[in-house]
């Protein structure tokens, strides 16, 4: 399937010079959404993960159905203050400031193999922080899969040493 044709491109959003890749047009098409999830499932299956981790918020839209298809659990990675229990956190630098990601402290066990699934690989900052967060728990990152990769932002360089898969590349 030509997944690219299901991605709406919105120029100058959220600011001038940005070409936004809108996945909602793929999500609303049942056949395309299922085919995209199935393609990611086949790639993730190869890494034999124990769990799928998806960063907030669009990582939930792909990570949860991938976990379901594989018959394994899904663990959400959230922004600070969104999880009710004890958490493990990782702070990372943004272009102008910093951000933090959290996961429940008991969600991931040492030695588990974890696959990260998200909608977009841009600069790699969020995914790199997610990987560090997983590794803080004593687990291993088994691979990373994305619906879209913006290759010109070179996020893959930041993820050297990890298996990275992208369904659509711009």
UniProtKB/Swiss-Prot annotation:
Biological process terms from the Gene Ontology for this record are:
adenine salvage; AMP salvage; purine ribonucleoside salvage
Give the record's subunit note: Homodimer.
What name is this protein filed under?
Answer: Adenine phosphoribosyltransferase
Reaction(s) catalysed by this chain's protein: AMP + diphosphate = 5-phospho-alpha-D-ribose 1-diphosphate + adenine
Q: What's the EC number here?
A: 2.4.2.7
- Record bears the keyword Transferase: yes
* Pathway entry: Purine metabolism; AMP biosynthesis via salvage pathway; AMP from adenine: step 1/1
Q: Name one GO cellular component term.
A: cytoplasm
> Which terms does the record give in the GO molecular function aspect?
adenine binding; adenine phosphoribosyltransferase activity; AMP binding
Which of the seven top EC classes does this enzyme belong to? transferase
């Amino acid at each position: 399937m030509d997944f690219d044709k299901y991605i709406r491109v919105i120029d100058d959003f959220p600011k001038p010079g940005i070409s936004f890749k809108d996945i909602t047009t793929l999500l609303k098409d049942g056949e395309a959404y299922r085919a995209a999830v199935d393609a990611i499932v086949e790639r993730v299956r190869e890494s034999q993960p124990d769990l799928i981790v998806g960063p907030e918020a669009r990582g939930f839209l792909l990570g949860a159905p991938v976990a379901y298809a594989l018959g394994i659990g899904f663990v959400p990675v959230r922004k600070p203050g969104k999880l009710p229990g004890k958490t493990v956190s990782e702070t990372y630098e943004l272009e102008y400031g910093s951000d933090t990601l959290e996961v429940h402290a008991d969600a991931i066990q040492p030695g588990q193999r974890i696959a990260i699934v998200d909608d977009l690989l841009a600069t790699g900052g969020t995914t790199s922080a997610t990987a560090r967060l997983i590794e803080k728990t004593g687990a291993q990152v088994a691979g990373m899969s994305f619906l879209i990769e913006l290759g010109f932002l070179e996020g893959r360089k930041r993820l050297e040493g990890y298996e990275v898969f992208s369904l659509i590349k711009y």
